[in-house]
């Protein structure tokens, strides 16, 4: 049986140690983010869906990560400033973490254990492009790249995992969120 991710200890972007329990009862989209990535414009869509559904109990949670071509090199303060001034991010952001390897954060250990594979867009060539560039994940369940997403239900259990190239406003992601909000 899957454990709730809500008891996991995390550090917010301002350095406060907390758990995700304060988000209990909400549907969450947990995303590993980066500021200098070709997928960084997804911040805009993440903010759009956060604003559209926050009143229904939906929240995006951003976890910066510098493991993919060092595309998140800044300090937490620099990341926060960039996200708020460039993309108008209002959703909760957290301290930079590792999502793969020996230093994988316990949150991502739980997320990946609950959803070892990601749903990708039909005919997506993203994984093949990563492999062709020598950037294949070390293990099949590793996070592939920045902006991989995990949808978590109100009970703290993982519902689905979405590949980095599946945008937040993709119809499959949107429908999954709507179904989770209806529960």
Swiss-Prot record:
GO CC annotation terms, alphabetical: periplasmic space
Tell me which residues this entry annotates as catalytic: 37
Q: What induces it?
A: Induced by oxidative stress conditions.
Which key words tag this protein in UniProt? Answer: Oxidoreductase, Periplasm, Peroxidase, Stress response
**Which ranges form a coiled coil?**
none
- Entry annotated with the keyword 4Fe-4S: no
Under SUPFAM superfamilies, the record lists: Thioredoxin-like
Origin, by domain of life?
Answer: Bacteria
Single biological process term from Gene Ontology: response to hydroperoxide
Q: Record's InterPro entries?
A: BtuE, Glutathione_peroxidase, GPX_AS, GPX_CS, Thioredoxin-like_sf
Q: What happens when the gene is disrupted?
A: Deletion has no significant effect on the binding, transport or utilization of vitamin B12 or other cobalamins.
| Molecular function (Gene Ontology), one example | thioredoxin peroxidase activity
Q: Where in the cell is it found?
A: Periplasm
Q: What does this protein do?
A: Non-specific peroxidase that can use thioredoxin or glutathione as a reducing agent. In vitro, utilizes preferentially thioredoxin A to decompose hydrogen peroxide as well as cumene-, tert-butyl-, and linoleic acid hydroperoxides, suggesting that it may have one or more organic hydroperoxide as its physiological substrate.
Protein name in UniProt: Thioredoxin/glutathione peroxidase BtuE
Q: State the species of origin.
A: Escherichia coli (strain K12)
């Amino acid at each position: 049986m899957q454990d709730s991710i809500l008891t996991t200890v995390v550090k917010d972007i301002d350095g406060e140690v907390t758990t995700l329990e304060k988000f209990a009862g909400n549907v969450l989209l947990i995303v590993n983010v980066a500021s200098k990535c070709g997928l960084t414009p997804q911040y805009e869509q993440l903010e759009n869906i956060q604003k559209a559904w926050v009143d229904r109990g939906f929240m995006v949670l951003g976890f910066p990560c510098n493991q993919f071509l060092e595309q998140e090199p800044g300090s937490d303060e620099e990341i926060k400033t960039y996200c708020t001034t460039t993309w108008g991010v209002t959703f909760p952001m957290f301290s930079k973490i590792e999502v793969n390897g020996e230093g994988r954060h316990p949150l991502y250990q739980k997320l990946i254990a609950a959803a070892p594979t990601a749903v990708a867009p039909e005919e997506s060539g993203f994984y093949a492009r990563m492999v062709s560039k020598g950037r294949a994940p070390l293990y099949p369940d590793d996070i592939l790249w920045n902006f991989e997403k995990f949808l978590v239900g109100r009970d703290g259990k993982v519902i689905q995992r979405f590949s980095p190239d599946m945008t937040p406003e993709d119809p499959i992601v949107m429908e999954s969120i709507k179904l989770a909000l209806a529960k």
